[in-house]
């Protein structure tokens, strides 16, 4: 039997050095943003080619997910309706600002992914606002609509991948900010 535990032996040989958070390569945020924007734009093009405005919803996963084409000149729940171009300019500034920050000052992996999602969503919807004067939405959730109808009598908005990126990234960022920060425990050398 060893006089010390394995951890004690290792810590006597190798000092515990705090490590920086693991990071992606500096180009990763730009690639992730481009991939998410491409996916968003592809689905919007598909929806414009295959779905009809005011047509009945097409169930994908019955009761959970439907295809339903609509357009929005504002933000969620039609807030700021008729303001597509000013909203698009604001979104593109936010998206490019976040992406520039990530490229200029690399962050840990979690924050890089979350902020890249938000940037991609902002830029994806700004492309629609600048090109068409409206944002193309096509994803509807009957399940989420049932919840919002029970709470306040309104249907959950129809959304797109860009919206999912912004909302998902924001929720993840909020949850992470509420969790206690994990700190590495430093071993105290024994005398």
From Swiss-Prot:
It is an enzyme of class 3 (hydrolase). The keyword Cell membrane applies. InterPro entries: Peptidase_A8. It is a multi-pass membrane protein. Pathway: Protein modification; lipoprotein biosynthesis (signal peptide cleavage). Its main location: membrane. It comes from the Bacteria. GO terms for molecular function: aspartic-type endopeptidase activity; endopeptidase activity. Its EC number is 3.4.23.36. Signal peptide: none annotated. The active site is at 137, 163. It catalyses: Release of signal peptides from bacterial membrane prolipoproteins. Hydrolyzes -Xaa-Yaa-Zaa-|-(S,diacylglyceryl)Cys-, in which Xaa is hydrophobic (preferably Leu), and Yaa (Ala or Ser) and Zaa (Gly or Ala) have small, neutral side chains. One of its GO terms (biological process) is proteolysis. One of its GO terms (cellular component) is plasma membrane. Keywords: Aspartyl protease, Cell membrane, Hydrolase, Membrane, Protease, Transmembrane, Transmembrane helix. The chain crosses the membrane at residues 26-46, 84-104, 110-130, 156-176. It is found in: Cell membrane. Pfam families: Peptidase_A8. PANTHER family: LIPOPROTEIN SIGNAL PEPTIDASE. Belongs to the peptidase A8 family. This protein specifically catalyzes the removal of signal peptides from prolipoproteins. This is Lipoprotein signal peptidase.
